[in-house]
């Protein structure tokens, strides 16, 4: 069995926690959550993360941040947060993010193998600012909880087309994305500069949102979709939004969730980037085959990998067995579950139950499907199949654009293999593929 965990739809595993300060357009009753000003990742990015053999380690201490003020240093190994062991870098980042500004936390570390305990007073997450738009912080209510909503409003008068961003797999905040030079940042920034209203709805328990944690069993795909539906309905009420020209930009697993959204709340069109057209079960088998072959496994071993994965996926997606039970079936099954970035069983199983053909049969809207040829997390065939599905029910409504050299994260790579093994050369630059921004803007402008 190979040591490569399947690369699925997670955009970024290790993200710097912001420390920049700034003003904001407006906010509401949701309290501001905290940041610590650290970038944390496994000690060795080339190896699987493990709290004993490859623990979460501070890579960067941001100037002016709470971590710097408390005396934390690059190279410190994170052992525990408030007496609870730190299992992964993502675990640490998530637990910090659930604290409010002004909270104190105690972090146990190893510094050059010597144990230390450091108390950190957390700072508020900065509000976004823009010279091109007013940033509106508000919320929507869902099942007795509130989801943080971030809206950019053009400074020009009149009604403007709107775009809701739906991100991919995982638990993360989109607050601060506007100025991020990678990921969704350049796309959101370009929309803002071109006088689109943009909206981001945080997932449950992420950013300033309250409600169940994103990893909680109650955090289902259907619940996530209802948050986006509530966001769309709010967006259409603003006097600076043209409610007849509201779009969705969805990435990776996002278009699957979007297929649940558009059957509940109409939109004018959708951009689906780096996604799939078949069921998650079928996709996952081909994903293992594709990536095992990419890293050079003999084809008899590739076949064995796929067969083993089929057993794991059958138990999880077809028989709906709990993730913990499936993980016990073997290391490959455990790897499959880990690749879902902590998402609860029911969330992933609801994704697995989706028939995209059934969903898109009910939604007659224009759709642009984008695929970058250096993305090994999906394939051109998956994207073309999604286009075929949509056009079979609604002729001419879906179109396909292929971008040479673009990876799953919208950056440029020489090949799918380079994307798959990118963490072996963490300092190698991969410039953002600006062509994806141009393609999205062109299509949106043609449809309003």
Regions found by a protein language model. Name each.
Residues 124-157:
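N-terminal cap/lid segment of alpha/beta-hydrolase-fold proteins
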Residues 67-90:
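Conserved PDZ fold ligand-binding element
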Residues 26-62, 98, 121:
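PDZ/PDZ-like peptide-tail recognition elements
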Residues 363, 369-371:
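Short beta-strand/loop motif that positions the catalytic acidic residue
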């Amino acid at each position: 069995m190979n040591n490569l965990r399947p690369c699925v739809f997670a955009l970024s595993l290790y993200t710097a926690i912001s420390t920049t300060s700034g003003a904001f357009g407006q906010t509401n009753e949701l309290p501001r959550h905290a940041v610590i000003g650290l970038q944390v990742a496994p000690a060795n990015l080339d190896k699987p993360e493990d709290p004993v053999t490859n623990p979460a380690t501070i890579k960067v201490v941001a100037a002016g941040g709470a971590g710097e003020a408390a005396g934390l240093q690059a190279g410190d190994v994170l052992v525990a947060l408030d007496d609870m062991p730190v299992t992964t870098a993502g675990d640490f980042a998530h637990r910090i993010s659930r604290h409010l500004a002004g909270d104190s936390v105690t972090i146990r570390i190893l510094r050059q193998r010597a144990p230390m305990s450091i108390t950190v007073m957390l700072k508020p997450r900065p509000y976004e600012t823009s010279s091109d738009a007013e940033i509106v912080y508000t919320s929507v209510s869902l099942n007795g909880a509130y989801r943080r909503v971030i809206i950019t409003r053009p400074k020009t008068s009149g009604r403007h087309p709107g775009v809701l961003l739906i991100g991919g797999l995982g638990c993360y905040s989109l607050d601060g994305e506007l100025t991020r030079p990678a990921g969704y940042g350049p796309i959101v920034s370009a929309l803002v500069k071109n006088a689109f209203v943009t909206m981001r709805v945080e997932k449950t328990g992420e950013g300033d949102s309250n409600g169940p944690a994103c990893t909680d069993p109650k955090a289902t795909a259907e619940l996530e979709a209802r948050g986006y539906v509530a966001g769309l309905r709010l967006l259409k009420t603003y006097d600076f939004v043209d409610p007849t020209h509201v779009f969705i930009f969805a990435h990776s697993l996002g278009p699957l969730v979007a297929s649940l959204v558009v059957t509940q709340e109409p939109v004018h069109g959708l951009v689906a980037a780096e996604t799939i057209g078949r069921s998650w079960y079928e996709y996952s088998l081909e994903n293992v085959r594709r990536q095992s072959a990419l890293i050079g496994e003999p084809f008899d071993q590739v076949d064995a990998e796929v067969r083993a994965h089929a057993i794991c996926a059958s138990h999880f997606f077809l028989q709906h067995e709990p993730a913990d039970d499936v993980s016990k079936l073997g290391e490959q099954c455990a790897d499959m579950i880990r690749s879902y970035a902590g998402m609860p069983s029911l969330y992933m199983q609801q994704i697995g139950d989706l028939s995209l053909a059934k969903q898109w049969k009910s939604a007659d809207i224009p759709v642009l499907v984008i695929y970058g040829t250096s993305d090994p997390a999906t394939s051109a065939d998956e994207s073309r199949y999604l286009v075929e599905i949509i056009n079979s029910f609604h002729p001419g409504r879906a179109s396909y654009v292929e971008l040479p050299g673009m990876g799953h994260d919208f950056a440029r790579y020489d090949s799918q293999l380079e994307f798959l093994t990118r963490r072996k050369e963490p300092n190698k630059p991969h410039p953002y593929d600006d062509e994806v921004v141009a393609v999205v803007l062109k299509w949106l402008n043609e449809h309003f």
